[in-house]
Amino acid sequence: MPSRLTPHKSPKEQVSWHHRFTMSEIATADIPDMRVSDVELKMPSSSPSYTSLTLQQLSESGYSSQELFFIIGSDAFSEIEQWHNYPNLIEQSHFVVISRSGLSNVEVRKKIPSLSGRMRTISATKDQIADLDRTTKSLSIWLIETKTRNVSSSDVRELLYKNQSTDGLLPAAVRSYISKHHLYSDRPHTTVLP
């Protein structure tokens, strides 16, 4: 689900929601049972896209908190206590925390000891991930330890700005879409620090 207006970025720093939605559809086209949600497009445009408001909108659309799994990197999750509407936010869905290079899930437990009792560690096997929704009746925070590349979306955008290879980082069809629509060819009007 592409964010309509990320709270920590200005509109000038973001490619349009329509393009991000289309790229998400292209990237997930071959994944069975996965679809990209447009719920954020339907939300009021006057406020930033806070996760808690999006999860509330999904709840009002008929999804129970037990059916929702918010997938997030360990680096972003480690800052969850600073997010809008915390701690209520973590009562709105399960959280699936994927380890990122430089911040293991063991370190996440240490950074947020108040949530440690709700955290469950599993390996990134297909069977364990498929069983997430059947292993507990309460909302959980699933820590998935896996090997990920040490690359961020900012790093990928930087490669695109420099017209460098993104092989292995972006599906070829997404890179083709980016080229066709001349996305990420100019830097946003912000200062980029080294």
Tell me the role of every PLM-derived stretch:
Residues M1-P194:
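Nucleotidyltransferase catalytic core that binds NTPs
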